[in-house]
Amino acid sequence: MNVSKEKKAIVAGMVGCLLYVIGDFLFAAIGKNQSADSIGLMVKVAYLDMATWRMVLSIICGVLGTALYYIGFHQMWKLLKRHLSQPKQRKWVKMFQAAYLTGTVCWGYVHAMFMNVALIFKFTFVQYDDMRAAAEIANKVFYCNAAPLLASYILCDVLLSIVMLVLIWERMLPLKSTGQRILASLCNPI
């Protein structure tokens, strides 16, 4: 079976999305015997029991996911650019490009930031045996990074979702039925 480079790139983007989900699960999953308590906004007590390999694997999933996500989005942009040539459509293709480029970079950063907050909390606690102080340090690191987190959410999730919804509902994408448009609308980042 001969699969085109375009299809391979789109599949790579889907695999990247799956790696994000796996990385997020490794980061967020809490066992039955682990505490779900939080200290401050970002620190969970469960990070202390989380194996370091899970944190490292989550970071690797985020890095690989970002690269593959970019490949898929770049291919989608090339397809949109090729098929949408009217001036009104071009505006949305450019907005799609801006959203996926900035959003992909931001989400790679955000994933690493979340993991680093967990690692800072865990290793500060191990070193100094003071949970409150470790949580305070980790939360301060998060607060310093809150603005880029908000920017990444606005650029990647909100802007990309708006652009995709316009492309879907203004019938710029070749979706034949309302059911297909609804399903495509549900596959947005938000």
Label every PLM stretch briefly.
Residues M1-I190:
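Hydrophobic, aromatic-enriched alpha-helical segments typical of multi-pass transmembrane helices
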